[in-house]
Amino acid sequence: MKTHRSALIVAAAILAGCASNAADSAQSKAKPGQIGHVDSEGFTLISDGTWTGWKVNESQNSWSLSEGGFRAQGERSHNFYTGPLAPFKDFELKVDVKTAPNSNGGIYIHTKYQDSGWPWGGYETQVNQTQGDWRKSGSIYSVQDVKADKLEGVVRDNEWYTHHVVVKGNRIQIFLNGKLVNDFTEEPGRKAGKDFERKLSEGTIAFQAHDPKSVVHYRNVRVKKH
């Protein structure tokens, strides 16, 4: 019986290894613009202008496909990454973002899928150039916020920019078009909040549709694990 079990364990390990190698091979063969393509900086593309690997929760009509990515406009809704690379812990995220004037959006990290409501898990990094909320793009929402004067000449409405989030250990850095706008270190022993967790752990990524007056585009989503 032990010999039989050992043989089964070895066979299972071989199959798992084959599956992993097949996935790695498929990823290495992915062309630019295809999910799984790895660029020269080691980032893996996880969005290709379709819904593959993504799941919208409530108010699904708030989302559409446009300009090679996701377009958000409508009642509160969130679009979660559900692909095979999740969960993420220490990692980098790059997203190309474009906002219409007076628009509000958000990018969540270390979060988890939920059917409705504002995501409880993880942190939100704000997307907002000119909408009324004083917390602007690059803010770690209600934790360490960025004001408008820090974004002058960095990002503008109606123009694509790169939103780059780096998570290593207890530190979050946010770069907009290559400029560091936020550098936050989570204090040891930080407790989860009541209304929102606002605490590092691990999880997935989500994009926000904030309200019917806000139009935000998200595309070319790529990640690199550390």
Where are these regions (language model features)?
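Carbohydrate-interacting regions of secretory-pathway proteins
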Residues: A19-H226
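Bacterial N-terminal signal peptides that target proteins for export
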Residues: M1-L8
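Hydrophobic alpha-helical segments
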Residues: L8-I9, G69
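Bacterial N-terminal signal peptides
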Residues: I9-G17
